[in-house]
């Protein structure tokens, strides 16, 4: 085949594809719905592909008529179009699920996995492909452009959120740069939507506190932190605190394990991991939900971040008489900031008719 013939064939193929796409675009748009029957991207893709196969099998096993052939062809085109629409989200999901490997000077390999970003990918898929229109999917597709700037490191790497008990940090997956991550919101974002996000964050905090992060810590990391305690002549269990573990992880370049500070502290001290009863954990979450509206009502107009999660859980434990848990929720060291939180908390307690206990 000469060059001219090849070029003509390419042009013809391109014209056919363009025509098919134009037909696809002129089809009646699928109506938006409120709720999806799927809970994950994997489940959605598998479910839809199985549905296509069942429909095609039914047509193939039925009477072979011109009408059935046309329906089968149309169904195959719909399946192709579905895959074309879905592939970008599958790629985005897979990229976020890919295990990243970092090697230190001794060629020790540690596996790091981002756990917080794929939910957003699934929500965007639901909005664009499944046509699910609700608060969570809308929130996913209307993210501000500044979010991309926040989650991009100066070295070009991606900054990922790591939950450490009741605190979040942004950690670069390339150079390891760490910086505090403060959850903020604007007037455009609904209080209900932010409450949903905060409750999810609270659940992650409680999981981290109980060593239920779902991430295994390599023995090399635990041994390195243990060596730091030994170097600093810290041996008593009361001195092996999560805050110290975090300090040593940062020094050793293991900031990606911030979410495991309680687990590591327990592994070194030999103290069993804290376990909250289901009833108490549910009570914490219920109380947390109850304070959302009063907080929004009483927060200073210029305040953009929520109360410290440590502070909130400390107050919950205090109210419920769970004094043995107070040690797990270290409060802010700055008395002024602590007082500012007390001012808001006092108004929240008044609204909910809870007992107010002054912190400072």
From Swiss-Prot:
Does the entry feature the keyword GTP-binding, yes or no? no
Q: Which stretches of the protein fold into unnamed zinc fingers, per the record?
A: 153-175
Q: Report keywords, A-Z.
A: Metal-binding, Transcription, Transcription regulation, Zinc, Zinc-finger
The record, for InterPro entries, names: Poxvirus_VLTF3, VLTF-3_Zn_ribbon
One example of a Gene Ontology biological process annotation = regulation of viral transcription
Metal-binding among keywords: yes
Q: Provide the GO MF annotations for this entry.
A: zinc ion binding
Q: What does this protein do?
A: Putative transcription factor.
Family label: Belongs to the nucleo-cytoplasmic large DNA viruses (NCLDVs) VLTF-3 family.
Protein name, per record = Putative transcription factor B663R
């Amino acid at each position: 085949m000469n060059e001219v013939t090849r070029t003509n064939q390419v042009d013809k193929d391109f014209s056919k594809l363009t025509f098919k796409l134009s037909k696809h675009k002129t089809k009646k748009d699928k109506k938006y719905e409120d709720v999806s029957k799927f809970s994950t991207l994997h489940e959605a893709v598998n479910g839809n592909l199985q549905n296509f196969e069942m429909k095609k099998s039914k047509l193939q096993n039925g009477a072979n008529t011109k009408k059935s052939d046309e329906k089968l062809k149309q169904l195959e085109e719909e399946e192709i179009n579905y895959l074309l629409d879905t592939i970008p989200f599958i790629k985005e999901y897979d990229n976020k699920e890919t295990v990243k490997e970092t090697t230190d000077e001794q060629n020790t390999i540690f596996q790091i996995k981002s756990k917080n970003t794929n939910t957003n990918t699934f929500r965007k898929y639901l909005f664009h492909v499944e046509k699910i229109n609700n608060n969570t999917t809308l929130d996913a597709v209307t993210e501000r452009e500044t979010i991309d700037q926040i989650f991009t490191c100066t070295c070009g790497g991606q900054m990922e959120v790591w939950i450490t008990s009741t605190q979040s940090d942004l950690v670069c997956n390339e150079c390891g740069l760490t910086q505090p991550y403060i959850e903020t919101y604007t007037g455009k974002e609904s209080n209900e939507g932010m409450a949903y996000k905060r409750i999810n964050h609270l659940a992650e905090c409680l999981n981290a506190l109980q060593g239920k992060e779902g991430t295994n810590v390599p023995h090399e990391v635990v041994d390195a932190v243990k060596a730091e305690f030994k170097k600093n002549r810290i041996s008593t269990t009361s001195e092996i605190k999560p805050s110290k573990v975090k300090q040593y992880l940062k020094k050793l370049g293991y900031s990606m394990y911030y979410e495991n500070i309680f687990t590591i502290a327990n592994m070194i001290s030999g103290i069993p991991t804290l376990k909250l009863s289901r009833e108490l954990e549910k009570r914490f979450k219920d109380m947390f939900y109850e304070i959302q509206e009063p907080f929004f009502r009483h927060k200073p107009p210029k305040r953009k971040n929520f109360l410290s999660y440590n502070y909130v859980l400390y107050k919950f434990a205090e109210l419920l008489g769970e004094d043995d848990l107070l040690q797990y929720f270290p409060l802010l060291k700055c008395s002024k900031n602590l007082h500012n939180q007390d001012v808001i908390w006092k108004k929240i307690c008044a609204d909910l008719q809870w007992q107010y206990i002054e912190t400072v």
